[in-house]
Amino acid sequence: MPPEAKRIVVKGFDPRKSRQRQETYYVTMIDRLNMALQVVMAGLGLKTGYQELYSGVENLTRADQASRCFNILQHHMSSGIQLLKDSAESFIQLEGTETDTNACTVVVGCWNKWLERVEIVQNIFYYMDKTFLSHHPDYPTIEELSLSLFREKLMAVKNIQIPFLNSLLQSFENLHSSKSTDHAYLQDAMLMLHRTEMYSSVFVPMYLVMLSRFYDTESSQKIQELPLEEYLEYAMSSLEREDAYVEKFDIVRDKKSIRETVQRCLITSHLDTLTKGISQFIEKRDAHSCKLLYALLQFNHETEYLIQPWSDCLVDVGFKLVNDESKDDTLVQELLSFHKFLQVVVDESFLHDETLSYAMRKAFETFINGAKGSQREAPARLIAKYIDYLLRVGEQASGGKPLKEVFSEILDLFRYIASKDIFEAYYKLDIAKRLLLNKSASAQNELMLLDMLKKTCGSQFTHSLEGMFRDVNISKEFTSSFRHSKAAHNLHRDLYVNVLSQAYWPSYPESHIRLPDDMQQDLDCFEKFYLSKQVGKKISWYASLGHCIVKARFPLGNKELSISLFQACVLLQFNNCLGGEGISYQDLKKSTELSDIDLTRTLQSLSCARIRPLVMVPKSKKPSPDTMFYVNEKFTDKLYRVKINQIYLKEERQENSDVQEQVVRDRQFELQASIVRVMKQKEKMKHDDLVQYVINNVKDRGIPLVSDVKTAIEKLLEKEYLEREDNDIYTYVT
């Protein structure tokens, strides 16, 4: 068995006296807490005794005196908030104005004082707060009690709340007006509103009204005073400023409604003015302002309101360009520059907005194909001419920019052109000249562009063009074969002949000329050789396309003249003249057998241009039958080989007319062929359906007029390919 435990006896212990001492301690501690709370709530602070008070609250809480402590605490906090309320109310009434920012300062001051006093209370009553109040739902924590008292006993008082809110809003308005404002007390005020749960229900609605009123007034003034691009800068900076205020003053939860309010005032209210301003930015080539405008509209999903002004602006600018005949020389460069700028705007300023990109493409199609009168076909013609210039000059014409990039930009324009057959006709004429007269700067560039056209338009579009290149290459091989044959041994001079297939090349007028005997013998020799190799074929000579290198001995020096065959034949007539003798116009006409038009043009190029190997006597713009021509004995030039261009009298206008006529004829044939194909397949069709079907079939090469389709139908009716039944129904005749 374990030993018996010893009993300890406390002598003189009296339970009744112990309880009395406890009660005395509780009363004493309660009195001290009352005194301490009274001092704290009066704002006098406690110098010492924190530890004793803290221990006293802990002991009271452990002794189930927490409810008693809470009642004391609640009483003194209520008294304390009453003191602050009376102080604030009396000061605000003394100031006598609701909009004075002092009201906000006073309330924020009360709030900061209250926080300081509550912090002391929390330190003293920490144990009770954490072990009793936090675990009893019927009791608020000290923080909950303090916030509730401040909200209900101070902020709910109308004599304080209304002046405070008006004062706070005035402070924010001063802040927006760039007036001096203490940011720190505004931050304290916002913290107070958040913690007292008055932010959303009381402050935000009034703040939005203030913002609306402020920006409505300011934006209406700014839109009148500032240039539009500066107004956009102002609007964007205002939105960025509001975002900064939202973060700084902890208004993040209402950022969306604040931004929508500001955007409505700055953007939506002036939407018509702003969107129409796009025309100013386009004319000034101001991509930055376009970017600002789009960004501002995008905030409220209002970019759709930019589509029509954007489209109208592009069409207006485009029509000004294409309808101005005086701008023909620079039209393509201006269109390229305009298109490149707009592409930058769409890609960078409008963030690849597909709707605005589509509107841009439709605008280009509208003005490029909708010019007035003779300018209607100008873009197609001038693009072909500009390409010709680039291919003749090379990269020097593009300022050193790779031609592949330039061609790509040109083809972007080319895609908008409806009359691609017009472009093809001019391009075909120009490429023929470059190939036949060896005027192309680079065969590689020619083939590169041809490949790009093929990818853009298809092989049918480039079929004839590819045939032209094949003819030139075959001619090189054939001429080389001729030069190495026995037939070439008796040639009087070096000869190169291009043998062309009529199906691929433009049609040229047959201009007659009587060649010098030795020249004619050389051509006859080549023709005989060619026909011996190509049985069943026939050769037709086009002297107007010929060119020569002629060696000339002038008194001031020997030269080589790069000239046309017509010019060469005229100059060679002067080999028979003795010193100082001349030849009359009439004699030259007789010896060369040139027509008056060709001879006049040739003589003008030799005697009236900048480079003049001949002298006309008497001088005139147009020679008469008696006009005399002499060798220019003072002729000189810094170059040994001198290029003398032919003078084309009104040829460009005539060429344009000829091309137009040829295109019209080709279109009629193409329309008739398309109608026959359609009717052969359908057998019967209504008039309107047939017209629309045919237009859709041929639109890739050019959109025909409805009247042209009707004309083609009438011709097929005359040729009895079609029959017309009642109700405008056509039947195909097999």
UniProtKB/Swiss-Prot annotation:
Highest taxon above the source species: Eukaryota
Pathway: Protein modification; protein ubiquitination
One annotated GO biological process: subtelomeric heterochromatin formation
Pfam family, one: Cullin
Glycyl lysine isopeptide (Lys-Gly) (interchain with G-Cter in NEDD8) crosslink, residue number(s): 680
GO CC terms: CLRC complex; Cul4-RING E3 ubiquitin ligase complex; cytosol; mating-type region heterochromatin; nucleus; pericentric heterochromatin; subtelomeric heterochromatin
Stored InterPro entries: Cullin, Cullin_CS, Cullin_homology, Cullin_homology_sf, Cullin_N, Cullin_neddylation_domain, Cullin_repeat-like_dom_sf, WH-like_DNA-bd_sf
Localization: Cytoplasm; Nucleus; Chromosome
Posttranslational modification: Neddylated; enhancing the ubiquitin-ligase activity.
GO molecular function, one term: ubiquitin protein ligase binding
Primary localisation category: cytoplasm
Subunit structure, as described in the record: Component of the Clr4 methyltransferase complex (ClrC) composed of at least clr4, rik1, pcu4, rbx1, raf1 and raf2. The cullin pcu4, rik1, raf1, raf2 and the ring-box protein rbx1 are components of an E3 ubiquitin ligase, whose activity is essential for heterochromatin assembly.
Its biological purpose: Required, indirectly, for activation of ribonucleotide reductase through the degradation of the protein spd1, thereby supplying deoxyribonucleotides for DNA replication and repair. Also has a role as a scaffold for assembling ubiquitin ligases. Component of the Clr4 methyltransferase complex (ClrC) which contributes to the establishment of heterochromatin by specifically methylating histone H3 to form H3K9me. ClrC preferentially ubiquitylates H3K14 and ClrC-mediated H3 ubiquitination promotes clr4 methyltransferase activity for the methylation of H3K9.
The protein's name in its UniProt record: Cullin-4
Organism in which the protein naturally occurs: Schizosaccharomyces pombe (strain 972 / ATCC 24843) (Fission yeast)
Lineage: Eukaryota, Fungi, Dikarya, Ascomycota, Taphrinomycotina
This protein's encoding gene: pcu4
